[in-house]
Amino acid sequence: MSLSRARALALLAGSVLLPSCAFDASRVRVGSKNFTESFLIAEIYAQALERAGMRVERIFNLGSTEIALAAMRRGNIDLYPEYTGTALIDVLHRAPIPNAQQAYRIVSQIFKQRFEIVWLSPSPMNDSQGLATTSEIAASRRIRTLSEVAVAAPQLRLATIQEFLSRPDGLPGLQRAYGGFAFASVRTYDIALKYTALLEGKADIASAFTTDGAIFSDRLVVLEDDRHFWSAYNVAPVVRQAALASRPQIARVLNAVSPAITDRAARTMNAQIESAQEDPADVAAAFLKSLKLTGART
């Protein structure tokens, strides 16, 4: 399927949430949110299930976390990829937890009790927030950690997105955790353009998500969160209990795939889609083919 057709179908599917509906055991409905990495990982899940012989319906581009979770609870979708940090902070309104195992344990327990949603095995991929720079700036300014950026900030220009300036796990939280971070200038951009500003010399530091494709394609440096401020954001399939009870093999299939979705793999695949303009379905297919999973159908 071409990228344009996939996007058109995704937009159509995600534009309206249907009324609540009963579980349809003849197919597995896989959802996604409205950004590249969510499309990609949802497509990996969908193709893995298809390779195992299941019928899959894709309901992508649902929008925000709130919309995706509502679709799950209504029974409009059976599973989608979610991040532990997003569930912890945006859904459960808890404080950030840097420890990946602890964050996963909390969200999996509460989601099962409160929403009848099961978290399957998480991937090692951790799409946390971060600050990035070029290797040249990191070397010339001698900045490797966030503590060093906090001190050097009055001589540095920040490129970021608007919400980073107000979120508790954005700039205000960094200032509380590290002190400093009084940048010489702060300018806001669209998500992709903040990296352009960095590469064109209009900024010295950019806010980042640590699996962004630009980090791989532009060879950027992610600065070390040496005080472990940011929460873990490991991705995992979240599945309705009713769907899992009817098709327990969903867990076996997706738990076999999740360990292979690493930071490096995610950055590479995101770059293939965003920079090289490859079709997410093709990228997902190549990834699954490389795994050579036993029992998969081709």
Enumerate the predicted regions with their spans:
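A bilobed periplasmic-binding-protein/Venus flytrap-type ligand-binding module shared by bacterial periplasmic
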Residues: Q129-A139, N234-R247
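N-terminal secretory signal peptides and thylakoid transit peptides that target proteins
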Residues: M1-G14
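Alpha-to-beta junction loops
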Residues: R73-E82, P154-L156, G173, L199-A208
